[in-house]
């Protein structure tokens, strides 16, 4: 970066070598240029400086991980400090990298003595010396902690504390108002990171609540019968590689949703395999809806063929059919209703019986169907 001889410009460059000094979270974002100008020679030079100001752009620096990024937040090496002192203020007796010295070195660098390494060091040091640096660092670490396992969260907190201590050891910090552009930048990105953490936490919390709800549903289902607790034969047969005692011990195990996929699957299988096995056995015992046993259906068809002219069994006949087939009366009623709709068309005489509403009982009992059905006088074994 170059600057005019009659102005002082301090663009905050966040790209460059990270081996000589601290880094900050803002290196991963595009940031506004912080520039101060001094007017000395009129409108032409101001216009030239403004064009130069608009041409600056900050480069994103991609870190391999947040831990590597935080571990890079260490004070500059003694060699780097000596390099800055020898280039910018060799006669200064103040402590290295004090806030006033940073400002003085920044002015010298803007006058033509800067280098990529020195400018990067100065920008990093200036940000770390800002009063809001610890707040910014904490907001960044909180974003990284969302959804992280407990051990990773502990390492992040430890690294954050080390980085804050490293920043404090660099010397006295600046005060608000000395650099309004930097103040505005730090405030804006702190607020942005806080909002980002809130947006990250919202779906994570919803997922945790959903998992807890599902776990409660599993427990309510499994506790409905003694066999589903892992004590029954179904659970023992289901777990050939384990024992029922092991299943009981796993009932109070906490399933960590942050575990790896394979580990999580293993925990769920160990905890709920007995429950699921028992439920499966109970479901298999239930008959499929809409399909009657073959033998019972054949007996109903035999009765249907013998009474095809008028396939309306009486209540006594239904009881006899229920006893012989093992079905309940509701199943028998439904079967005859469906069978008549699909396979029965009354004859002309029967149509007259159905349509004659004036003397239905007399016609039914006297002329057409006067003889009682055989089923009224025989046992269910003869159907």
UniProtKB/Swiss-Prot annotation:
State the encoding gene.
STM
- One GO cellular component term: plasma membrane
Q: Which Gene3D superfamilies match?
A: Homeodomain-like
Q: Name one GO biological process term.
A: floral meristem determinacy
- Which organism is this entry from? Brassica oleracea
Q: Where does this protein bind DNA?
A: 284-347
Q: Where in the cell is it found?
A: Nucleus
Q: Where is the ELK domain?
A: 263-283
Name of the featured protein: Homeobox protein SHOOT MERISTEMLESS
Q: Which family does it belong to?
A: Belongs to the TALE/KNOX homeobox family.
Q: Which UniProt keywords apply?
A: Developmental protein, DNA-binding, Homeobox, Nucleus
